[in-house]
């Protein structure tokens, strides 16, 4: 069952301006080490950061909190599954909020799509609650 949906659309030039104006301070405040390594290695660095920024905004909306109520930028990070599909990795207050949302006997799956077409970057997040299979030998 779907328990959260969020989307965000951002102007890449806004992130480009923040990178130029605030540099490392902006990057280190908003992005995880994995995101920094991934984005800094890209040809279009600003677009890469913009997609990840939009993903964080979309995820915070799917959590139902926005960037408030104990949910912070660096607690939501874009990571890739072994096949390359992007998803969100949550820690701290973001992970706690996700646990609060989950019905008993369910686990979360976070679906993420990110894209860019200059000057825009977009992200869409769906949080799904999936039933956990009972352990063998239990009733």
Swiss-Prot record:
EC number, UniProt record: 2.7.8.7
Protein name: Holo-[acyl-carrier-protein] synthase
Organism: Sinorhizobium medicae (strain WSM419)
Catalytic activity: apo-[ACP] + CoA = holo-[ACP] + adenosine 3',5'-bisphosphate + H(+)
Subcellular localization, as worded in the UniProt entry: Cytoplasm
Gene name for this UniProt entry: acpS
Protein task: Transfers the 4'-phosphopantetheine moiety from coenzyme A to a Ser of acyl-carrier-protein.
Keyword Translocase tagged: no
Signal peptide extent: none
Record: residues binding Mg(2+): 8, 57
Swiss-Prot/TrEMBL keywords: Cytoplasm, Fatty acid biosynthesis, Fatty acid metabolism, Lipid biosynthesis, Lipid metabolism, Magnesium, Metal-binding, Transferase
């Amino acid at each position: 069952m779907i328990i959260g949906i969020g989307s965000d659309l951002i102007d890449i030039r806004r992130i480009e301006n923040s990178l130029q104006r605030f540099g490392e301070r902006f990057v280190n405040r908003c992005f995880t080490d994995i995101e920094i390594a991934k984005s800094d290695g890209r040809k279009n660095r600003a677009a890469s950061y913009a997609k990840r920024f939009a993903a964080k905004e979309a995820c915070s909306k799917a959590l139902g909190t926005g960037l408030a109520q104990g949910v912070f930028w660096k607690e939501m990070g874009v990571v890739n599954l072994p096949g390359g599909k992007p998803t969100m990795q949550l820690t701290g207050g973001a992970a706690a909020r996700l646990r609060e949302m989950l019905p008993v006997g369910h686990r979360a799956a976070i679906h993420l799509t990110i894209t860019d077409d200059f000057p825009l970057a977009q992200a869409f997040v769906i949080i799904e609650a999936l039933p956990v299979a009972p352990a063998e030998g239990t009733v």
